[in-house]
């Protein structure tokens, strides 16, 4: 098959699989579906990835790469903790809203259990991000001298849950536009977390 030699890279396979997983769901998408969408033979697909689980792992890993690059690395250099947190909310929300980064949606939506060694690696990266957010919230609480009613951990889970659920209902042509959503979510979070 001529297409076998034209396939750009593993990234093209991952982008296509992410699109299919997003549209159909992980369980409803077969390796045949992915191969067909790429105009590859099944053998050509297996040359790059041994299993659908391996594809899902790489999609989730790429989603974490995107989060680290576009959120964590983007805010690390901001010295003021409150401004750093405001920017984190903005950047994380923009990542979730980005249609280009289907990997994020797949990671947020798919609860299919990966094989334990792969799941452990993804979970470790997710925990690192949660701790980063939690520590930043604690730092803002110290600077603002809040009364400590809201724990940084509970606030981190609330913030991430609030932002990560957006992909379920947000429509670019809807009543809430991205910038307005960023402002409102930031206001809601700051009003509740820093009493």
Set out the residue ranges of the language-model regions.
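Helix-turn-helix
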Residues: 6-8, 12, 16-54, 58
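Short coil/turn segments at alpha/beta junctions that flank glycine-rich nucleotide-binding fingerprints
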Residues: 23-27, 78, 99, 143
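Conserved hydrophobic residue
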Residues: 27, 146-147, 176
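Hydrophobic/aromatic residues within well-ordered alpha-helical segments
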Residues: 52, 59, 63, 67, ...
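Hydrophobic alpha-helical connector segments
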Residues: 58, 72-100, 156-159
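Amphipathic alpha-helical packing segments from all-alpha helical-bundle domains
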Residues: 65-68, 106, 116-142, 153-157, ...
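C-terminal peripheral helix-coil segments that are non-catalytic and often amphipathic
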Residues: 91-95, 131-139, 160-162, 168-195
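Amphipathic alpha-helical segments used for helix-helix packing
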Residues: 97-117, 134, 168
């Amino acid at each position: 098959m001529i297409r076998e030699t034209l396939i750009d890279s593993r990234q093209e396979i991952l982008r296509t699989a992410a699109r299919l997983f997003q549209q159909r769901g992980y369980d409803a998408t077969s390796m045949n579906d992915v191969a067909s969408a790429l105009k590859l033979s099944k053998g050509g697909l297996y040359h790059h990835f041994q299993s659908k689980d391996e594809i899902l792992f790489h999609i989730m890993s790429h989603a974490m790469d995107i989060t680290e690059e576009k959120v964590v690395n983007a805010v690390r250099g901001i010295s003021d903790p409150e401004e750093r947190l405001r920017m984190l909310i903005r950047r994380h929300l923009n990542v979730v809203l980005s249609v280009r980064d289907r990997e994020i949606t797949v990671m947020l939506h798919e609860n299919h259990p990966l094989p334990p060694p792969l799941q452990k690696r993804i979970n470790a990266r997710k925990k690192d991000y949660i701790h980063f957010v939690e520590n930043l919230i604690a730092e803002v609480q110290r600077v603002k001298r809040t009364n400590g009613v809201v724990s940084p951990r509970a606030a981190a889970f609330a913030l991430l849950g609030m932002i990560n659920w957006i992909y379920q209902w947000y429509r670019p042509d809807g009543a809430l536009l991205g910038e307005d959503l960023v402002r409102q979510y930031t206001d809601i979070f700051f009003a509740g977390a820093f009493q």
